[in-house]
Amino acid sequence: MKVRASVKKICRNCKVIKRHGVVRVICVEPKHKQRQG
């Protein structure tokens, strides 16, 4: 899980979603998981 100021899709499997007001990236590749913070 990377915590970043700006979350971006890294590959085509990445999805940007908003959970409880937190922007997250979920992906099949565990390295691509990100959260805004």
From Swiss-Prot:
UniProt record, GO biological process: translation
GO CC terms in record: cytoplasm; ribonucleoprotein complex; ribosome
Gene Ontology terms, MF aspect: structural constituent of ribosome
InterPro entries attached to this UniProt entry: Ribosomal_bL36, Ribosomal_bL36_sp
Keywords: Ribonucleoprotein, Ribosomal protein
Superkingdom classification of source: Bacteria
Keyword Lipoprotein: no
Pfam family, one: Ribosomal_L36
HAMAP family: Ribosomal_bL36
Entry's family note: Belongs to the bacterial ribosomal protein bL36 family.
Name by which UniProt lists this protein: Large ribosomal subunit protein bL36
Organism: Psychromonas ingrahamii (strain DSM 17664 / CCUG 51855 / 37)
